[in-house]
Amino acid sequence: SLINDIINTYKLAHKDVKILIVVHRTELLDQISATLNKFGIAHGFIQGAREQYLWKRVQVGSIMSLLTDKNYYNVCRQKFDYIIVDEAHHSLADTYIRLFGLFPNAKKLGVTATPWRLNHESFLSLYQYLIVSPQISWFINNNLLSDFDYVSIKQDSEVQRLVDRSEVVSTGDFSNADLDNTFNNQRIRSKLYESYLQFANGRKGIIYAINKCHAAMIAELYSSHGVKAMAIDCDTPRDVRQEMITAFKNGEISVLVNVDIFTEGFDCPDVNFIQLARPTKSLSLYLQQVGRGLRIVEGKEKTIILDNVGLYNYFGLPDAN
């Protein structure tokens, strides 16, 4: 809709417009392409080995492909009027700064549901204005997001004390190695399944794990109890990953245990439980994770959020102002 509005505004002024939409993951590129197709907007791709049609007025490109030696010359020759960045909380990275430098006259629009960074770095060096959407509670009250029930560990629980004592690294978040040493054991993993069995048994959902080993062990645990669960991460081959996602959307898999795959852009509205098994100090990551379960679809009443690592005790409920 936004792209159509931009194109139509230029048409009224009898001008052509060229738009670049930038993403950082293949899954996001495919989802944006599907949305553009739904609105009848012709577009090309700048990503990997895909055939390029640079004459099309709308291009969807991955940030890494845009700056490769192979594409750099052709990209520089384009005269983009607009650069739209999806998941724009990443746009302070050097790669995006470099891309923006190639098109100093282009208008830039960053879109994100989580405009915060752990290092508190400001976005004002890139964007002049911040347009704030309503709070999550508004979207829930207006039936645009799903309502939820939230189940968390207690503030004085053993797991919460372990989280509070976990090592914090220079990024401002917990050390993955320390989290793995502390939480990737049979006793604590069994608590994940126990809470699933009590509050979300039979539901379709996503679990957020610390690392690949943690994800694999959780998937194995759930599978041993008859739950159709599989682990997925960034090293899962793209074709296998797509097969797993399709099987999940079709209901052939009930639970996907992931590592940093479904924090952004993943759209499967009938997900009706989320399980948090990875501690974090990042508010953005917290909201991205629970947000995967808040999409609405006909027949969906509520999402169950199982917080097994006490993120509620850091951030409150997802719909808090």
Language model features with spans:
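Conserved interdomain linker/interface between the two RecA-like ATPase lobes of SF2 helicase motors
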Residues: L130-I206
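Conserved Walker A/P-loop ATP-binding site and its immediately adjacent core
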Residues: L2-D5, Y10-K11, K15-K38, T95, ...
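Walker A/P-loop
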Residues: S1-I6, Y208, I232, V257
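Conserved helicase ATPase core of P-loop NTP-dependent helicases/translocases
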Residues: D30, G44-W55, N71, A216-E220, ...
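Conserved RecA-like P-loop NTPase helicase motor core
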Residues: M64-S65, C234-A320
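Conserved helix/coil segment N-terminal to the catalytic DExD/H
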Residues: G48-Y82, A93-R98
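Post-DEXD/H (motif II) to motif III coupling segment of the RecA-like Helicase ATP-binding lobe
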Residues: H89-V151
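Conserved strand-helix element at the start of the C-terminal RecA-like helicase core
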Residues: V17-L29, D178-H225
